[in-house]
Structure formats: C-alpha cells, structure tokens
C-alpha cells in the first residue's frame, strides 16, 4: 500500500505524515511531496520513528516521482486561512495549485483514490473532477473531498455539551465544507437530545469552528493539527477499504448522484474501488431540512466556480 501526501511540508501535511507514519499498516510506503526544499528532511525526521512504514520525501516543482505507484493520494497543498479571510479568499491561489497537482495525478497514478483537503473544498473537488475528465481518467468513485474535520468537531462538541464518551458519539455531517454548507445531523445522534437553542448554537459552532481556530491562533495559522488527525482518519479508512475490510463508512464530499447538488457530503461505504456505495443520510428534522435547502444555492455556486475555472 502506497500513500502519497502532496503538501507534506505544511502544517496539515506534517501532522498528517506523522500520524500516517505511526498508523499505516506494516509494510506500507509513505511518500511525501512539497514544493518546499525541507520536504526530504521531513521524511528523514519521520524515518527515525520505529514503525514498519517506509518513507521518502520529494521536493521541487514536479510531484511525479512521489506519485509513481500511489494507491492513495492526499492533497493538502496550498495557502492557509488568516484572520479576516474566508475559505473562498483562498480560491485565487489554491485553485491553480490543485489543478496543477491533479494534472500530475491523472498522468502518473490515474486509478489512485484521491482525497482533497485543500480549501475551498466545495470548489477544489469540482476542479479536480474537471481536470480528470479532460484527461479521460475521471472515476467519481475515486475522488473525495475530505470533510472529516466537520465530523470530528461535531463528535467532540456534542460529547462536551452532553457529557458523553466521545468514542460513542456518531454523527453524519452532510452538505459541503464551509460555513452554512456544513450541516451536522444532530437529530440522528443516539443517546442525546437537544433543545432547539442547543441545535442552533451547536450547528453554528460547528460551521464556524475553523474561524474559531484561525482567530485563536492570532495570525499564526489555521486548523492544522485537528485537520491532520481528520485526514489521517479518512486516509486510513480509504486504505482499509482497499484492503477489503468490510463496513468502512465515512462522510465525504463526493459526486454521488445526490438529488441536491453535483457534489454533496454524505455517508459512503468504502471498498476496493473507492466508493462501493453512496448511503442515504436518513431522516432529518425540520430545522435540518430547512438548513439543507437554504445552503444549496451557495453550494452550487461554489461548484460552478470550480467547473468554470477549468473550462
């Protein structure tokens, strides 16, 4: 099993690489790429950790050497949010970065499972899909926007609010990966009930949690460590699915034939071909149905931005 991390010298990339080095199955290969010259050194640093995961780092303009033979590619390259910026402010820089990297993925490892972390995810996933279509290698079952950070934040905040064991909290988060497009389905959480006020405040907190971190870091960065953990969880689920493990389900932003939008975050069953099955997200409350319907114009606009960028 070979996993490539593109953007491996950044805050998310280094956290993700550390977690993968310690958690990938024995015998795996971990390939780190970043434009920054420090990247081979990050790999050397991680190589001293005593796990049976081989690691190699690559720097420079061309990620191709890092991508050869990759089964899973996780892309965190790009600029991070600063105070006062929203995820769409990142579009101007990150759109081009994702396009260029996906062109190399399409040419080098077209059947790899690709997880996009680079924001704005609502748009960068659409860019990746269009680039792959142009290259004639698009498989909607192999492209994912990683929204797991919204899921782990939901799990954490629910457990804190209700005094639950966080390991027991399961919650689907649907829609997209920014602002109002993030919709945690709190009505489905087992073992917890919420007042209308709690639903409103918790939903808003989950939607704005990224900004909470950006402001707390006071110009020193965005959510890198929690995002690294979220990306590792999702990446390991992709690996487990590829290895044939049963019942691996994660929420992800995918081209899943949703009635709501071309790309939509929802639960998916993972397997040897990436998405084995897009799962229904179940019954929702009136609050959730209204929030879902009201986000769709925003989400569709984000998607169109990505499609138009490539065309």
Swiss-Prot record:
Binding-site list for substrate: 81, 87, 119, 153
A GO term for molecular function: L-malate dehydrogenase (NAD+) activity
Disulfide bond entries: none
A single Gene Ontology CC term: cytoplasm
Catalysed reactions, semicolon-separated: (S)-malate + NAD(+) = oxaloacetate + NADH + H(+)
Gene3D superfamilies membership: Lactate dehydrogenase/glycoside hydrolase, family 4, C-terminal, NAD(P)-binding Rossmann-like Domain
Active site: 177 (proton acceptor)
BP GO terms, sorted: malate metabolic process; tricarboxylic acid cycle
E.C. no: 1.1.1.37
Residues engaged in binding NAD(+): 7-13, 34, 94, 117-119, 227
Keywords: NAD, Oxidoreductase, Tricarboxylic acid cycle
Subunit organization: Homodimer.
Family per record: Belongs to the LDH/MDH superfamily. MDH type 1 family.
Biological role stated in the UniProt entry: Catalyzes the reversible oxidation of malate to oxaloacetate.
Protein name: Malate dehydrogenase
